Amino acid sequence: MYELQQHRRFSALDEMLPAFYYCYLLCFPVSSDNRAGTSELLQTSLSSLAEERPYLTGTVRRDMESSVRKGHLILDIPNPFEDLRIVFNDLRGPKSQWKETYQDLKDTGMPPHKLDANLLAPLTAGIGETRKVMSVQANFIHGGLLIAFCFHHNFVDAYGAGRIIARFSEHCNGTVDLKNSADPEGDGTGSRGIADLLDVELLKKQYKFEDLESDPNLWRLNCLEFRGVNDFRWPDFIPALLPVRKPPVISSMFSFSSDALAEIKAMAQPSQSGAWVSTNDALVAFLWRHTMRARFPSSITESEPPNRKSNVVVALDGRKDLSISPTYIGNCLFHCFTDLPINMVGSESTHLGDIAIRVRQTITAARNETLLKAVVGLAATHPDCQAIKYANDNLGPDLYVTSWIDLPFYKLEWGPLGKAEFFRIPDRQFESLCCILPPKDGVVQLITSMEEDHSKRLRSDAEFTRFATHR
């Protein structure tokens, strides 16, 4: 069972993130004559989930006069209870902008560039016109259903979003009995809704900002620019669409078979005796190399300026390292930076294993309980959680890789809907990020957003496409 924590309050790590929404899509084949029954199932189940955990109906408020610190986040939960209503969107009419059938999309592998967030998502990525913590939209197209789940990033990370969706599926599947179910014991959040080691007020009694601010590693594990205060401020809530990037960014999806992943891992075997890298380390190194070659072609011949550095950043879920309950849905996200000269990353003479082992060493070093507690301490004692600046240029010399391999979307049963056939994100949602999707039938897919010229260069890279199939 995917139980959720009983109560919810914002943590130090929640407050280090910008106020934006992100969207996940689950895709199901559904016949046209099942719309009424499907709609009733979804709304009844979401209402049941909201009744079980009323904080899911809440809104985010930033308190600029808080005694805790400037910009402290507060979760406002409606009292009396307000239901969480699904937006039902029928895209099957003759005047609809939507043209593809579900079978059309399925035949082409459900490509992200066909999934327009402006049509499918209740809260488009980057828009903060509402302060809801989550919203759901059910999009009916000919032959199918695309369910969009939008989450406020201050409220949940990818793991937390996945757990909420999984709990929703259990309500759809009829496996939750609210009258007889016991609240999860020992979730570590108690009635306050926050684990002690993430609580801003408690941490401010244990740590001092001036004792931590001189360590650049603590900033980077928070994904923040070293001492990046005062010169930049996030708005309370992003009020409109984020500006269009120039040059524009396009999304591409690539597939890696299990055989391709095994071969990449073999290529990335470190030269040092006894050294080990995971398949994920090898894939990150492979993606880093070929992304930098696409963006900086002269790095292949080591012709970039010798002092130019590149970072690959790997998202790390710290729940196990900090012994935080799996029922906790708030942000527990850390950011592992590995930096190398860009010529070394792109060079034909660099062994892939030399890159992969550096990625592994960075991740291993970050999985240290004392270190991560200090990272949270810095997050908690930062004097103004709006005056923060992020540390990497993901469309330039840096690459951010986030992996959703462990999210359970393809395992979930949704009652009469069965299992989802596809998990996707809308087009250009995570601009500049490389997102590794949960595996399906042994195949790992990833979605990457790049400037168009860079994307074309990547797709024409023979060494890259020997392992990766463009979808």
Curated annotation (Swiss-Prot):
* Recorded GO MF terms: acyltransferase activity, transferring groups other than amino-acyl groups
Tell me which InterPro entries the record gives: CAT-like_dom_sf, Plant_Fungal_Acyltransferase, Tri101-like_N
Functional pathway = Sesquiterpene biosynthesis
EC number(s) recorded for this UniProt protein = 2.3.1.-
The UniProt record describes its induction as: Expression and the subsequent production of PR-toxin take place under static culture conditions (oxygen limited), whereas no expression of the PR-toxin genes occurs under the strongly aerated conditions required for optimal penicillin production. There is a negative control of the transcription of the PR-toxin genes by the penicillin biosynthesis gene product(s), or by a regulatory peptide encoded by a small ORF inside the penicillin gene cluster.
Gene3D superfamilies the UniProt entry points to: Chloramphenicol acetyltransferase-like domain (3.30.559.10)
What keywords is this UniProt entry annotated with?
A: Acyltransferase, Transferase
Q: Does the keyword Transferase apply?
A: yes
Is Transport there in the keyword field? no
Which family does this protein fall into? Belongs to the fumigaclavine B O-acetyltransferase family.
Stated role:
O-acetyltransferase; part of the gene cluster that mediates the biosynthesis of PR-toxin, a bicyclic sesquiterpene belonging to the eremophilane class and acting as a mycotoxin. The first step of the pathway is catalyzed by the aristolochene synthase which performs the cyclization of trans,trans-farnesyl diphosphate (FPP) to the bicyclic sesquiterpene aristolochene. Following the formation of aristolochene, the non-oxygenated aristolochene is converted to the trioxygenated intermediate eremofortin B, via 7-epi-neopetasone.
Q: What is said about its interaction partners and assembly?
A: Monomer.
Per its record, how is this protein called by name? Eremophilane O-acetyltransferase prx11
Q: What species is given as this protein's source?
A: Penicillium rubens (strain ATCC 28089 / DSM 1075 / NRRL 1951 / Wisconsin 54-1255) (Penicillium chrysogenum)
